[in-house]
Amino acid sequence: MVRWSRWFMANSHKDVGTMYLMLGMWSGFGGLNLSWMMRLELSRPGMWLPSSEVYNGIVTLHAIMMIFSFVMPVLIGGFGNWLLPMMLGSIDMSFPRLNTFSFWVLPPALYLVIVSCFIDYGSGTGWTMYPVPLSSTPYSGGISTDLMILGLHLAGISSSAESINYLVTFLNVRSKSFKAEFSPLFVWALAVTSFLLLVSLPVLAGGLTMLIMDRDFNCSFFDPSGGGDPVLFQHLFWFFGHPEVYVLILPGFGLVSHVLVFYTKKLRVFGSVAMMYAMISIGVLGFIVWGHHMYTVGLDVDTRFYFTAVTMLIAVPTGVKVFSWIATIYGSYLSFEAPTLWVLGFIMKFTMGGITGVILSNACLDVALHDTYYVVAHFHYVLSMGAVFTIFAGYIHYFPFFTSKLFSPVLARGHFFLTFVGVNLTFFPQHFLGLGGMPRRIPDYPIFYYYWNQWSTIGCAMVMVSVSLFIHMQWEA
């Protein structure tokens, strides 16, 4: 019991960070299995699952587990807790008990989200939970959607508490002689991420509370029959939802900078101050571009022009970061160890995802491509090959520091190449499916789309094998 009580009563930032990593990895495996179920359904025309409601429930659970229970806990909670105090020269976080609280709120949140999918047909709303029709009572009348909303509320409480802790630690624990500009880039990434979460999460909480009032207390915030407006929910959700995608990738930017500096054997990353201001710019611009998710809801031409222009503007600070990483690599004696491979893969595939993002930022093109597999391919290139690649780069790089053990270099490289080929084979064909007009979140399709869906399923099978190799690699270490 003594060994278990260490974890139940942990206040140390290292113990809490380890628990975040364990929860995140478990959720990542769960989310991957759900994606494999989706790919099996889409591997050939016709239905394999009992109904489309079950398929939509799988889509919803996959998205929420991957975003709120995998990428955020690992990048922000795991690496943040382990590295932030050490990079600032502190013995712990400013509020160790708040740190513990922010972790222990997450397992109940994950429990509510998972349980919701075993009630009725699950919550088939997608992670966006659009009301009228998807999450409205006539169409999602059971308790499953309510449990999903409560689970998201708990995840939001956890992230808010965590963000307060990180910001206070960043501002107060740092030595007064140690200027903020010279803080490591990962520290700055966490500071910007915490700011994004603190500003955007209350808006999501308000939107979800209004939604649950509509569902259970006869209000009509979003119901047109009672004078409400469903587009209001989209504005509230995407004001949170777009900063959220930067929350997922910014800590990864910081990790990539640190891993690159180590393996290029340079003193610092190229243009480190510009990199810092680029992250701040991305954070600020992230709050004023949410409308690009809503081009098809009836925004007027001037509004769509504004959101197109500002969305393209985000490519500037992002380009500063990408070219600074390339300049850091230039002229260095790069050792092709596993973390370096993950970083190089990240730079290539994140750039690819950014290019498709600029294409989708055009309102005239997005009207045609909205809710097709082109959008799925775009954000999976940014997340499945962006955020996840940074997680593996950081994890393999810092694993000896965390555990005093080493991964097998051969297995680590093999894991990278198998994953790299697998995710590309999974998501690259989806660009063609989207350009051909295949809609997302639909479990069946005409025979016309069979060829590229088959390749996509083969790629997903390769990713499943690579994850098995990762588990073996972990076990062997």
Swiss-Prot record:
Principal cellular location given in the protein's record: mitochondrion
Covalent cross-link 1'-histidyl-3'-tyrosine (His-Tyr) as placed by the record, residue numbers: 242-246
Localization per Swiss-Prot or TrEMBL: Mitochondrion inner membrane
Positions annotated to bind Ca(2+): 41, 46, 443
Metal-binding recorded as keyword: yes
Biological function: Component of the cytochrome c oxidase, the last enzyme in the mitochondrial electron transport chain which drives oxidative phosphorylation. The respiratory chain contains 3 multisubunit complexes succinate dehydrogenase (complex II, CII), ubiquinol-cytochrome c oxidoreductase (cytochrome b-c1 complex, complex III, CIII) and cytochrome c oxidase (complex IV, CIV), that cooperate to transfer electrons derived from NADH and succinate to molecular oxygen, creating an electrochemical gradient over the inner membrane that drives transmembrane transport and the ATP synthase.
Quaternary state and interactors: Component of the cytochrome c oxidase (complex IV, CIV), a multisubunit enzyme composed of a catalytic core of 3 subunits and several supernumerary subunits. The complex exists as a monomer or a dimer and forms supercomplexes (SCs) in the inner mitochondrial membrane with ubiquinol-cytochrome c oxidoreductase (cytochrome b-c1 complex, complex III, CIII).
Name of the protein: Cytochrome c oxidase subunit 1
Native source species: Pecten maximus
